[in-house]
Amino acid sequence: LGLYCGLRREEILGLKWDCVFLDAQAPYLSVRRAWHTEHNRPVVLDELKTKASRRDIPIPCPLADCLRATKEKSSSEFVIANSDGEPLSYTQFQRLWKYITTRSTKERTYVRYINGQKIRHTITPVLGEKAAHNSTVIYSLDFQVTPHQLRHTYITNLIYAGVDPKTVQYLAGHENSKVTMDIYAKVKYNNPDVLSAVVNNALSSVYGNSVNS
C-alpha cells in the first residue's frame, strides 16, 4: 500500500475494507481515515492530516490481486489488523515491521555476555543467504526500508513515468505543491545528461542553433 499507492503509515493502518473498491472497473481505494496511538493503544479517526489527504487512488493490478486474496481470508473491517481483527497498536506495528527489516543486508551488531564480559558481535548479511539464527529468514533487501521510503519510491516512480506534477501532488496527498515540486526537481533533474538536454532544448528555442556552438 505504501509502494503501490503511496499511502502514509497512518493511512495504511487506518484503512478499512469499505474504502477499498476491488470490484470497480478500475479498482481504487479512498483515503478517509487515519491511525495514531495514544499510550500504545490504536485510535482511528475520520479526521485526516490535511484536506489534500482525502483522495481516491488507483490500485495497480499486482496489489489488487494481493488485496483480493487477503480480503477472502479476513474477518476484520480493517485491511491491516491484529489477530483479534482490531487495528494495530504501535508495538504490534513495530513487531510486524521487524519481519521486513530483519531481511535487510544492513550490517548489525549484537551484544553477548560471556563470563560476565560484554562482547560485541558484528555481522554483515549477504543478499540471498539465509540467516544463521533462523533459516526461514532470507536476506532479500539490499537497503534499509521504512514506510516513508516506500511512499517516496511511489512518488519517484510516478515522476520517472512522466506523470505531471499536479497529478503527483493529488495522488501523494500533498497540501503544499512546494513539497511535490521539490521532490519532482530532485528526481527529474538529478541526472546531468537529462539536465543538459533540457537546458539545451530550452535555449535553442530562444537563441537558435548558436547555443550549441
Segments from the language model and where they lie:
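Active-site/binding-pocket entry motifs
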Residues: 35-37, 63-65, 73
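Short, charged phosphate-coordinating catalytic segments
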Residues: 2-35
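Short, basic (Lys/Arg/His-rich) helix/loop patches that form interaction surfaces
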Residues: 5, 57, 72-79, 83-87, ...
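Catalytic-site neighborhood detector that most strongly recognizes the C-terminal catalytic loop/helix
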Residues: 64, 172-198
